[in-house]
A protein has these predicted regions:
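Flavin-dependent oxidoreductase catalytic cores
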Residues: 1-232
Length: 232
């Protein structure tokens, strides 16, 4: 819980590689610690020695013939939810696509264009660091109620600018994130996008919407990883 990959976690991921997995994904790495940190076990490339633990784990996976991958995420309006450091939790502001009040009473601020630009750039920066640490694939977490999903969802996203409204606009943040990652890692480096095919609650996006989202982002990704549901 120090932002690094510990020896037990490394052994767990190496065991997956030994078992014959084609790719093994480490989860889940924050891209923008200033506005994120939902639980105690997030990885954080800003922590001293974290990249050394990344490199060691990537090598442990690769030595068994599997491709080491890392999942990049941002919790958005649910940042701080399960943090064990309560002093940091209480000092962490929550941000999402639109201003609202969470079901637990926490106020959420609307991300400005400047903050969106900063988070988009952070995805690329962390992806580049992961590549230098020896990872050969990136998973971008865009499902289950985290920030990218919040932009995709009409339930969370009530913006009236270029990031809200129709599906094309609601996909704009995800598209920019994926493009930022691609620019950082270069060609020939697979990008996996993890998404909820349907949010499975009234007011969220449907399976038909999920198909449209996948089609909208198809040209930005190499692999689509579909599950279902959301934090909400």
């Amino acid at each position: 819980n120090d932002g690094c990959i510990g020896p037990k976690s490394t052994a767990f991921y190496e065991l997956r590689a030994k078992g014959g997995a084609g790719a093994v994904t480490i989860s889940e790495c924050m891209v923008h610690p200033k506005t994120d940190g939902s639980h105690a076990y997030h990885l954080d490339t800003a922590i001293l020695n974290s990249l050394a633990s990344f490199a060691y784990t990537a090598d442990a996976i690769r030595r068994h013939g599997a491709i080491p991958s890392v999942e990049l995420s941002h919790s958005g309006m649910y940042s701080g939810t399960y943090m064990t450091d309560k002093s940091r939790q209480h000092g962490l502001a929550q941000w999402g696509p639109s201003a609202c009040v969470r079901p637990d009473g926490v106020e959420v601020g609307e991300l400005s264009h400047e903050m969106i630009d900063e988070i988009v750039a952070a995805y690329g920066q962390v992806a580049g660091l992961a590549k230098r640490a020896g990872f050969e694939m990136i998973m971008v977490h865009g499902g289950h109620g985290w920030l990218i999903n919040q932009f995709l969802s009409p339930w969370f996203n009530h913006r009236t600018d270029e990031y809200g409204g129709n599906i094309e606009n609601r996909c704009r943040f995800a598209r920019r994130v994926l493009q930022s990652v691609h620019e950082a890692v270069g060609p020939g480096f697979p990008i996996e996008f993890r998404m909820s095919g349907s949010e499975l609650f009234e007011g969220g996006y449907t399976l038909e919407d999920g198909i449209a989202i996948a089609q909208e982002l198809e040209d930005c990704i190499d692999l689509l990883h579909v599950s279902a549901g959301t934090y909400q």
